[in-house]
Structures are given as structure tokens and as C-alpha cells.
């Protein structure tokens, strides 16, 4: 059973986090290219423009907000594995404890490594959306009611 938990951490948790990072990166690149090439003058309505510019940004935000939790799940499983080994053997084997804790910390670190750049990417793209909306307002003579 403990071997399955170790494999779940190594392949399940780490694989999920790597998949999440690739999804965030792919969506981020696609959104950046789309936002950059969007011609604001082609939109009669600001709402239509905003809808077009913000497509799929929620995916990046979801990855950014959930990656730490996936990493935390790996941490909990790694610590569970460590305690199980200690309890089952009745003696403290430093090597096995360190391997279990290293596995736990690896999951936490990878969760943060995925979350932090995803958050930065999301905020960058939201800023680009705001710039395009301001360009639309300038062209159409509308003033934004909120100033940031």
C-alpha cells in the first residue's frame, strides 16, 4: 500500500502539476497572441471586446489558485507515508524518513513552482486586457468609471 502512495505522489501529483503547468503556459501563449492581434476598432461594443479578450483566462487563474493545493495533497501523502513507515517498523530509520519527507517537500515545491508563474502570467494578461479596453474607450470617446 505504501508503494502505491509513493507512486501516487511521484506520478499522480507530480504529473498533475506538470500537466497544469503546460495547460497554463499553452493558454497563456494563445491568449497573449490573441490579445495582441485583436483590433479594438473592429468592436462596436466594449462588452463584446471584453468577452473576446478574457476568453479562457479563467483556466490560468484556476491553475494558479489550485496548484498549491495539489502540492499540499502530495505533502500530506508524503508525510502519511513517512509516519506509516515509522509506525510499521517500530524503529526510526533516518534514510526512510528523509526519503518520505523529501517526497513531501518536492510536491509542495512543485505546486508553488506552478502557481507563482501562473499567477504572474494571469496578472500580465489581465493588464493587457485592460490596456485594450482603454484603447477602445479612447477610440470611442468613452471614459472608464473606475480608475486603477
From Swiss-Prot:
Protein's membrane topology: Multi-pass membrane protein
Pfam families per the UniProt record, alphabetical: MotA_ExbB
GO BP annotation list: protein import; transmembrane transport
InterPro entries, A to Z: ExbB/TolQ_transport (IPR050790), MotA_ExbB_proton_chnl (IPR002898), TonB_ExbB_2 (IPR014172)
TM regions (residue ranges): 9-29, 67-87, 97-117
NCBIfam families in alphabetical order: exbB2
Name of this chain's protein: Biopolymer transport protein ExbB
Taxonomic lineage: Bacteria, Pseudomonadati, Aquificota, Aquificia, Aquificales
Amino acid at each position: 500500500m505504501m508503494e502505491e502512495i509513493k507512486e501516487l505522489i511521484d506520478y499522480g501529483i507530480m504529473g498533475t502539476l506538470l500537466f497544469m503547468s503546460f495547460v497554463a503556459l499553452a493558454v497563456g501563449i494563445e491568449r497573449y497572441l490573441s490579445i495582441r492581434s485583436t483590433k479594438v476598432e473592429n468592436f462596436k461594443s466594449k462588452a463584446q471586446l471584453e468577452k473576446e479578450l478574457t476568453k479562457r483566462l479563467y483556466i490560468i487563474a484556476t491553475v494558479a489558485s489550485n496548484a498549491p493545493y495539489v502540492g499540499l495533497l502530495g505533502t500530506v501523502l508524503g508525510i502519511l507515508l513517512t509516519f506509516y513507515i515509522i509506525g510499521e517498523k517500530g524503529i526510526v530509520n533516518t534514510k526512510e524518513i528523509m526519503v518520505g519527507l523529501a517526497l513531501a517537500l518536492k510536491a509542495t515545491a512543485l505546486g508553488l513552482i506552478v502557481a507563482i508563474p501562473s499567477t504572474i502570467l494571469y496578472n500580465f494578461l489581465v493588464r493587457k486586457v485592460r490596456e485594450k479596453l482603454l484603447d477602445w474607450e479612447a477610440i470611442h470617446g468613452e471614459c472608464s468609471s473606475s480608475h486603477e
